[in-house]
A protein has these predicted regions:
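Accessory C-terminal segments flanking Radical SAM cores
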Residues: 1-12, 185-245
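Conserved alpha-helical substructure of the radical SAM core
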Residues: 1-120, 134-142, 146
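Active-site beta-loop-alpha junctions enriched in small/polar residues
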Residues: 67, 98-100, 126-128, 163-165, ...
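Short, electropositive alpha-helical surface patch
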Residues: 80-85, 169-188
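Conserved strand-turn element in the central/C-terminal portion of the radical SAM core barrel
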Residues: 93, 148-171
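Structural detector of well-ordered beta-strand residues that form the stable sheet scaffold
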Residues: 94-96, 122, 159, 187-188
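Short, well-ordered alpha-helical microsegments
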Residues: 102-104, 169-172, 238
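Non-cysteine beta-strand/loop elements that form the S-adenosyl-L-methionine
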Residues: 115-129, 186-193
C-alpha cells in the first residue's frame, strides 16, 4: 500500500490516552476502555525498520493523530518525528493532542523539532478552565496551559480546535481571545456530528438542536485527494482512518 504514489501519511503512533472523552471510539460512552483495543505504541525502531529514507524523501507531509490514542502518549514520538525530519528536512510534520500529557520540557523539545514553516500542533481544547474537562475528561487545565506556553515559546505553530456544546457555547469568543493572547496561530470552533452514533446519556448536549445529516453518494475520498494512507498503532496500513475504525 505504501508505494511511490504516496505523499502523505496519517500516523496513529499509540492507542494510549489520558482522557475519557464520551464520543471517542476508545471508550464505551466515556466509561472504560473498549475491549477491542490493545494498549500499544509504535517505537522509533519500527519506523526505521519499515519506512526507508527513500520513502521518507517522497513524502510531503506526515501527521500524528489517529482514532483511539493521543500521539503525545507515544513514548518515542519526538524521536519518530526526528527520523522523518532527518531524511526529509522539508517534510511537514503535524499532530493533534489534548495537551494534557507529558511535561513542559517535553513539549519544548517537541516544539524545537517542529520548526518547519508549516509544521504545527492542534490542541483540542473544548472551552475554558471551568468547562474543558466536561468533555475532555481527566484532562487538567493547568497542565494544558503549561504545555502550550512551553510549546509556543519555541516559535512552533499551535492551533486551538474547540468542540462546541451547550455547556461551553457561551465561551467561544473568550476562548478565541485567549488563543490570540497566548500566541496561537489559528483558532477554530466547531460542532460534532457524532450524535447519531450514541443513544445513551453522555452527560453532554449539542450546542444547537441536532438533526441527522443527509449524505450524498458523491464522496471525495481523501486517500485519492491527498495521495495519503493511514498507519495504525499496530503497524497496519489502511487507505484512511475511517476504514480502520
Amino acid at each position: 500500500m505504501f508505494n511511490e504514489t504516496v505523499k502523505e501519511i496519517h500516523i496513529e503512533p499509540t492507542s494510549v490516552c489520558n482522557a475519557e472523552c464520551p464520543m471517542c471510539a476508545r471508550n464505551i460512552n466515556g466509561k472504560g476502555l473498549n475491549p477491542y483495543i490493545t494498549l500499544k505504541s509504535l517505537p522509533v525502531k519500527w519506523f526505521k525498520d519499515n519506512i526507508t529514507p527513500t520513502q521518507i524523501k517522497q513524502l510531503n507531509k506526515i501527521f500524528f493523530c489517529g482514532n483511539v490514542g493521543d500521539p503525545a502518549s507515544a513514548p518515542e514520538l519526538i524521536q519518530i518525528a526526528q527520523y522523518f525530519k532527518e531524511h526529509n528536512p522539508d517534510i511537514i510534520v503535524g499532530l493533534n493532542s489534548n495537551g494534557g500529557l507529558k511535561t513542559k520540557d517535553w513539549w519544548k523539545k517537541l516544539g524545537e523539532v517542529l520548526q518547519g514553516p508549516l509544521d504545527y500542533c492542534v490542541f483540542s481544547i473544548d472551552g475554558l478552565e471551568d468547562t474543558n474537562h466536561i468533555y475532555r475528561r481527566n484532562v487538567k487545565w493547568d497542565k494544558i496551559i503549561q504545555n502550550v506556553v512551553s510549546f509556543i515559546s519555541t516559535g512552533a505553530r499551535a492551533h486551538w480546535d474547540m468542540l462546541v456544546f451547550e455547556h461551553n457555547k457561551h465561551q467561544v469568543d473568550e476562548a478565541k481571545d485567549l488563543a490570540k493572547e497566548m500566541g496561537f496561530s489559528w483558532f477554530r470552533a466547531k460542532e460534532t456530528d457524532r450524535w447519531d452514533t450514541y443513544t445513551s446519556n453522555l452527560g453532554i448536549l449539542p450546542a444547537n438542536e441536532y438533526s441527522s445529516r443527509t449524505y450524498t453518494k458523491d464522496i471525495t475520498c481523501e486517500k485519492d485527494r491527498d495521495n495519503s494512507i493511514f498507519l495504525d498503532y499496530t503497524g497496519k496500513y489502511w487507505p484512511c482512518c475511517h476504514m480502520a475504525e
